[in-house]
Amino acid sequence: MSTNLRKTHPLVKIINNSFIDLPSPSNISAWWNFGSLLGACLILQTITGIFLAMHYSPDISLAFSSVAHITRDVQYGWLIRNMHANGASLFFMCIYLHIGRGLYYGSYLYKETWNTGITLLLLTMATAFVGYVLPWGQMSFWGATVITNLLSAVPYIGNTLVQWIWGGFSVDNATLTRFFTFHFLLPFTIMGMTMVHLLFLHETGSNNPTGLNSNTDKIPFHPYFSYKDLLGLILMLAFLLTLTLFYPNLLGDPDNFTPANPLSTPPHIKPEWYFLFAYAILRSIPNKLGGVLALLLSILVLFLMPTLHTSKQRTIQFRPLTQTLFWSFIANLMVLTWIGGQPVENPFITIGQVASILHFLILLILMPIAGVIENKMLT
């Protein structure tokens, strides 16, 4: 009798060991669904993105009208465009929930998996930023101007760096064409990095809600988790379609329906909702370089999570002190997101500064201390 092709064929074997016969902990909850949902988001964004690229013109005189042309004249262009725009929001919702799961259950102790994951977050943020510039509306143009301008805070080479990225002395045609190039290229680097992320994950196997070793109790990925993930996928698609078909512009900025005009600055320049927390931290520091560093560190601080883990237990599941801090951290992020969308005036400035300090205080100081206290409570 010949052996199963699924287990012997060099190519199929990889797929089999990753998605079919993969030994998985029997007790992983729905919080472990987000990895596959992110994969689905990436595929969806790539497909809708390629179809949009077929009809888009990366030129400042054509970009805005080519997007209007897609939504008006292309078959189902309105659907493809709205799914792509709202798919990005969904992508970030899943990313943030996925990272939150990792923080809660101590998944960051798989260092390589965690570090590749944070790298994926940074790549996705870069992709979303350059993508937002492409429709060439007011917020596209001014968002690009403000964010690229932050690089001028780099000592000595700052101004040269900004002009090099712009391809001139302001955000212009050269900027748009290169941003289109990056927006097309980066998702493929994300795919490559995702492979590396999974490679490292499958070296150790998944973590589970208890944070204990689950080698004694593994079940095959298929049919158990393939169907469990399918349920998550159906729910996610239902949510995406509801958003796309009923409230397509709910998360967008009305300013982006006005073509880019370098002579008129919008009253409130702000990024999409998924960057607002970082934008609030950037604005909270009354110094350009300081703000840029705080902005970067607010995300890069995640790289330190494995180093800052002081507890004898892996998850926060059974640690009331750290649990309180974790949920305070989440609430604080929501406050930052709200502040990022508000004008720069009191009381928002003060609230933003307090929330920015808390963001770093909780992660870098309070959580490690809580871990030590909880260890003492155990002994």
UniProtKB/Swiss-Prot annotation:
- List the PROSITE patterns: CYTB_CTER, CYTB_NTER
Locate the residues binding heme b b566.
H98, H197
Q: Name one GO molecular function term.
A: metal ion binding
The alphabetized UniProt keywords are:
Electron transport, Heme, Iron, Membrane, Metal-binding, Mitochondrion, Mitochondrion inner membrane, Respiratory chain, Transmembrane, Transmembrane helix, Transport, Ubiquinone
* Entry's Gene Ontology BP terms: mitochondrial electron transport, ubiquinol to cytochrome c
Cross-referenced SUPFAM superfamilies: a domain/subunit of cytochrome bc1 complex (Ubiquinol-cytochrome c reductase), Transmembrane di-heme cytochromes
Q: How does it sit in the membrane?
A: Multi-pass membrane protein
Superkingdom of this protein's organism: Eukaryota
Co-factor remark: Binds 2 heme b groups non-covalently.
Pfam hit, one? Cytochrome_B
Which cofactors does the annotated protein need, by name?
A: heme b
Identify the GO cellular component terms for this protein. mitochondrial inner membrane; respiratory chain complex III
Residues that bind heme b b562, according to the entry?
H84, H183
State which residue ranges cross the membrane.
Answer: 34-54, 78-99, 114-134, 179-199, 227-247, 289-309, 321-341, 348-368
Q: Which InterPro entries match?
A: Cyt_b/b6_C, Cyt_b/b6_C_sf, Cyt_b/b6_N, Cytb/b6-like_sf, Cytochrome_b, Cytochrome_b_C_euk/bac, Cytochrome_b_N_euk/bac, Di-haem_cyt_TM
Q: Which CDD domains match?
A: cytochrome_b_C (cd00290), Cytochrome_b_N (cd00284)
Annotated localization: Mitochondrion inner membrane
Residues at which a ubiquinone binds: H202
Role: Component of the ubiquinol-cytochrome c reductase complex (complex III or cytochrome b-c1 complex) that is part of the mitochondrial respiratory chain. The b-c1 complex mediates electron transfer from ubiquinol to cytochrome c. Contributes to the generation of a proton gradient across the mitochondrial membrane that is then used for ATP synthesis.
Similarity section: Belongs to the cytochrome b family.
Any other comment in the entry?
Answer: Heme 1 (or BL or b562) is low-potential and absorbs at about 562 nm, and heme 2 (or BH or b566) is high-potential and absorbs at about 566 nm.
The subunit structure is: The cytochrome bc1 complex contains 3 respiratory subunits (MT-CYB, CYC1 and UQCRFS1), 2 core proteins (UQCRC1 and UQCRC2) and probably 6 low-molecular weight proteins.
Protein name in UniProt: Cytochrome b
